[in-house]
């Protein structure tokens, strides 16, 4: 019995142990599972956060790239719009000038037609008067002949002589009327032919008429370069203006720097200098001087290329090299506000077309028209520029007709051929375009600035003189070895007094003396 009880107790204990172990194991399994789940959830949250962070960073990167690309496209669009607006304004201005020119031509044609009608009426009235007079004379002559025939007491020789005299008088009257009629018809025909030739020449040739200004625009890659161009405390701008004699204007216009100077050649040199500095990426006073020296060497090639281009456009390929270089210099001179090279090209084309209409040598007419103002780019002379140009072209064995056309286009000598009249007429047409005479004021301002520079150059020790800010400042560069500081003060005073006595100007003019002393030594 005790054994049975013990067995039952053992079985019961085993059963209790099994149940307890089951529940204890289940508890620990649930505890471990909960921990794993929590760790997994934390890991999932961490992965989600990292993914969100990477997504945000990627989003910010793409947004930044899109913004930069949008800003770039916007700048390009604004620049393109600015260029197109400027081009549209220029085309609109050209169209207005062309319309004004056509209106003037139409008015001239109407005036000529009205004048011809008036002359035709006068001729008809004169013709009627002459006819009445001729009828009256015939009647008188017939009556006189009848009287002579009826007179019997005259000698036969006397009567015959009287009849002959009357017949001669009648023949002379008829001949005079015929000559007068032929002369009037010839004048009318010549007038119509001249008008037709001029109208044909003007209609066949279209020109871009723009008044030369004193500004050049240089485009830069970004506005950040403006700060480098200005330099610390503006030292780069000062060095640039001292080297080139050109005002440099840096304003709020995007990606644009403006150069201002009345001298086109000096302005072109400054433009080449600035482009070299921007290409090198190094901008400081020493680099500016070096770039200006390099640009000075290259400007001759630019000038010669301009002469070659205009000669080729007119198909004049036999012009001497020395003359080609002078034609290139015309690009940097103005006449009544118009570019001198463009003006000469217009005269050449007009003269060529009119010569072709009149069955004359069109090639020689174009050559004479292109070279007619060559004297304006030669060294100054006491003679008129037309005579100076004619004398210069003599050494190239040009024809007498061409030389006379050059020398006579301003009436300084007698015209000896139709070619001279054609060049004179073409020159007058080119200069009488709309707005040409209004540019005389601009030429006067340029001459005033040149005279200010010449006044300052007349003093000893002066190397260079530049008229800046539309003539409100004269900047004088002197030799540092020959002019001391005290002498520089006196020089500024003397130049100012001479300007007051010899020049006419509004307001006041600032005279700046720049004296630089450089000492160089070499260590060996």
Swiss-Prot record:
Any GO CC annotation of this UniProt entry: plasma membrane
Gene3D superfamilies in alphabetical order: Hypothetical protein af1432, K Homology domain, type 1
Domain HD: 340-432
Subcellular location, record wording: Cell membrane
PROSITE patterns assigned: HD, KH_TYPE_1
Transmembrane parts of this sequence: 3-23
Family according to the record: Belongs to the RNase Y family.
Name recorded for this polypeptide: Ribonuclease Y
């Amino acid at each position: 019995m005790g054994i049975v009880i013990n067995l039952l107790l053992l079985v019961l204990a085993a059963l209790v142990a099994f149940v307890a172990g089951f529940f204890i194991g289940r508890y620990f399994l649930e505890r471990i599972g909960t921990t794993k789940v929590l760790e997994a959830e934390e890991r999932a949250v961490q992965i989600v956060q990292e993914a969100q962070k990477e997504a945000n960073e990627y989003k910010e990167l793409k947004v930044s790239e899109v913004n930069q690309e949008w800003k770039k496209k916007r700048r390009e669009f604004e620049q393109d719009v600015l260029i197109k607006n400027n081009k549209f304004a220029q085309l609109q201005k050209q169209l207005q000038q062309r319309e004004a020119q056509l209106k003037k031509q139409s008015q001239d044609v109407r005036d000529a037609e009205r004048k011809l009608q008036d002359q035709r009426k006068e001729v008809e009235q004169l013709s009627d008067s002459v006819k009445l007079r001729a009828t009256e004379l015939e009647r008188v002559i017939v009556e006189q002949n009848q009287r002579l025939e009826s007179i019997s007491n005259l000698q036969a020789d006397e009567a015959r002589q009287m009849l002959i005299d009357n017949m001669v008088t009648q023949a002379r009257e008829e001949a005079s009327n015929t000559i007068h009629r032929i002369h009037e018809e010839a004048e009318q025909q010549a007038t119509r032919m001249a008008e037709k030739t001029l109208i044909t020449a003007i209609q066949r040739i279209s020109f871009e008429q723009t008044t030369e200004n004193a500004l050049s625009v240089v485009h830069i890659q970004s506005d950040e370069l403006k700060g480098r161009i200005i330099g610390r405390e503006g030292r780069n701008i000062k060095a640039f203006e001292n080297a080139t004699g050109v005002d440099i204007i840096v304003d709020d216009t995007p990606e644009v720097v403006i150069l201002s100077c009345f001298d086109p050649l000096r302005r072109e040199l400054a433009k080449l200098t600035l482009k070299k500095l921007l290409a090198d990426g190094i901008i400081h006073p020493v680099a500016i001087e070096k770039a200006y020296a390099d640009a000075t060497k290259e400007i001759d090639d630019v000038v010669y290329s301009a002469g070659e281009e205009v000669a080729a456009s007119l198909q004049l390929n036999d012009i001497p090299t020395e003359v080609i270089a002078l034609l290139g210099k015309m690009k940097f001179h103005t006449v009544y506000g118009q570019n001198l090279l463009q003006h000469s090209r217009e005269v050449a084309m007009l003269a060529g077309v009119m010569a072709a209409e009149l069955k004359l040598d069109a090639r020689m007419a174009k050559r004479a028209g292109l070279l007619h103002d060559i004297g304006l780019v030669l060294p100054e002379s006491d003679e008129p520029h037309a005579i100076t140009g004619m004398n210069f072209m003599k050494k190239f064995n040009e024809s007498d007709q061409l030389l006379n056309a050059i020398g006579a286009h301003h009436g300084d000598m007698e015209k000896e051929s139709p070619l001279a009249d054609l060049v004179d007429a073409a020159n007058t047409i080119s200069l009488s375009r709309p707005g040409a005479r209004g540019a005389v004021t601009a030429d006067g301002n340029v001459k005033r600035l040149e005279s200010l520079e010449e006044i300052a150059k007349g003093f000893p020790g002066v190397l260079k003189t530049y008229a800046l800010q539309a003539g409100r400042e004269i900047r004088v560069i002197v030799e540092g070895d020959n002019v001391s500081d005290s002498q520089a003060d006196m020089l500024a005073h003397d130049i100012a007094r001479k300007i007051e006595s010899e020049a006419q100007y509004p307001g006041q003019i600032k005279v700046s003396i720049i004296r630089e002393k450089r000492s160089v030594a070499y260590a060996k």
